[in-house]
């Protein structure tokens, strides 16, 4: 059992060392850690590598024990055969924790590697050192400037922590979170998880006051009952979004060779999520969408949607998509329809629900106000078409944004935007700009009917159970 205080030092280091970085990778780990806010050291015994390290302004030592101060966190990038010796050096130095990028252990299914991992595990567990990995990317802590990718942003604090068995997914999740305005507290990539596994991180961050939302990517478990117990406890107190890899036969085979984990059946995982209150997703995009919605939307427990902004055909598509997700687009009351009808004389316009969007600010305001005040509408969804390279398009969208900002300041009902378009001219940058503008008003944006329906249904499910 790792002491929580030791794990806290590991995840929030004031000092760190990188062991084994080399010029072949252009000293990737030392470059990643160049943003670290504390003291950083290198340990490298190869004389050919030392000049390149010192040119970076980093002091190199021949041994970890030579470093003249206590070390909180170590990133280890040495060959597999040296891993156990380096682990012992970390223990002798009194290091709080270490992330082992080193791979080639039990995930290879080679007996020699399996035996080496067992020896590694026994040494670590006996000492009480907090080991992340092996076969992992380690830690991303933006506030401390600890990174495992050079493009990861730093210098901010967040309320969302991601725990990932996959290093690749950990990188993708951190990038997607930053791009979509989800403020990261920590990202931990734990790989084989021989000392600290998913349940340990979940328990720790479940008790972490800075972490209000948890996202997890898991391929398999060492102790299913313990994980389930902890998940049930944590999910009562904060949202836990779970993405399970290896849910198909092909995925289970890939899992075995990736992190040497037992994947388990999809039915077992589905049942566990329902039992514990965890929210299950199937991709990075869905995880980020859902966490953004949980962070930004006021709590609602009814499934009635007020929808506006689409054409006739789009309204039909939205109605079908939301209905399949168990959501309702209720008819508006006679009073609401009469209010809309008295304002508009547009040929071909629909004043039912979904409602066609108006063409000027006054019309847009009336439509949004009418839908928001309707008693059988619990959540408002507004389709906003990102502009093409056209002044009229930009003016139309700005009218909708201004009206949404006004509405947000006058209602407690949740509002979300669908930035849906099949037009190639509506590129990603336009949607990203729109999403950023609306996030500043606590209005989440989704880029398809399907993603919107999935997220709203899951948020509703969470709200109804908490």
Segments (PLM) and residue ranges:
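Catalytic-core regions of core metabolic enzymes
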Residues: 1-466
């Amino acid at each position: 059992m790792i002491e929580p205080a030791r794990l806290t030092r590991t995840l929030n280091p004031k000092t760190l060392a990188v062991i084994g970085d080399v010029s072949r990778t252009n000293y990737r780990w030392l470059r990643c850690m160049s943003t670290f806010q504390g003291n950083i050291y290198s340990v490298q015994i190869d004389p050919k590598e030392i000049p390149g390290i010192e040119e970076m302004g980093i002091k190199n030592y021949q041994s970890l024990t030579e470093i003249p101060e206590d070390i909180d966190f170590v990133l280890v990038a040495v060959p597999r055969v040296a891993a156990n010796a380096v682990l012992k050096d970390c223990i002798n130095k009194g290091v709080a924790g270490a992330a082992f990028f080193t791979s080639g252990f039990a995930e290879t299914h080679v007996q020699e590697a399996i035996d080496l991992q067992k020896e590694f595990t026994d040494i670590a567990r006996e000492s009480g050192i907090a080991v992340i990995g092996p076969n992992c990317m380690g830690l991303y802590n933006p506030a401390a400037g600890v990174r495992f990718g050079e493009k990861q942003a730093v210098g901010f604090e967040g309320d969302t922590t991601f725990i990932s068995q996959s290093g690749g997914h950990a990188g993708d999740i951190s990038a997607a979170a930053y791009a979509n305005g989800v403020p990261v507290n920590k990202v931990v990539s734990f790989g084989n998880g021989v000392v600290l596994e998913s349940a340990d991180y979940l328990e720790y961050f479940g008790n972490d006051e800075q972490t209000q939302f948890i996202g997890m990517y898991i391929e398999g478990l060492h102790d299913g009952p313990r994980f389930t117990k902890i998940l049930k406890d944590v999910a009562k107190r904060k949202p836990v979004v779970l993405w399970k890899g290896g849910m198909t036969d092909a995925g289970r085979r890939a899992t075995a060779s990736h992190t040497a984990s037992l994947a388990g059946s999809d039915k077992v995982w589905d049942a566990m999520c329902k039992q514990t209150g965890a929210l299950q997703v199937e991709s990075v995009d869905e995880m980020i969408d859902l966490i953004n919605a949980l962070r930004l939307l006021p709590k609602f427990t009814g499934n009635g949607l007020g929808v506006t902004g689409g054409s006739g055909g789009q309204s039909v598509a939205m109605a079908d998509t939301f209905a399949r997700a168990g959501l309702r687009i209720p008819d508006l009351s006679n009073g609401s329809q009469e209010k809309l009808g008295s304002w508009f004389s547009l040929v071909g316009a629909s004043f039912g629900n979904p409602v066609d969007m108006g063409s000027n600010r006054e019309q847009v305001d009336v439509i949004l106000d009418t839908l928001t005040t309707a008693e059988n509408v619990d959540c408002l969804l507004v389709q906003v078409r990102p502009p093409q390279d056209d002044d009229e398009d930009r003016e139309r969208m700005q009218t909708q944004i201004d009206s949404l900002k006004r509405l947000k300041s006058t209602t407690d009902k949740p509002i979300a935007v669908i930035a849906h378009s099949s037009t190639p001219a509506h590129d990603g940058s336009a949607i990203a700009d729109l999403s950023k503008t609306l996030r500043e008003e606590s209005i989440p944006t989704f880029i398809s009917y399907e993603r919107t329906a999935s997220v709203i249904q899951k948020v509703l499910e969470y709200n109804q159970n908490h």
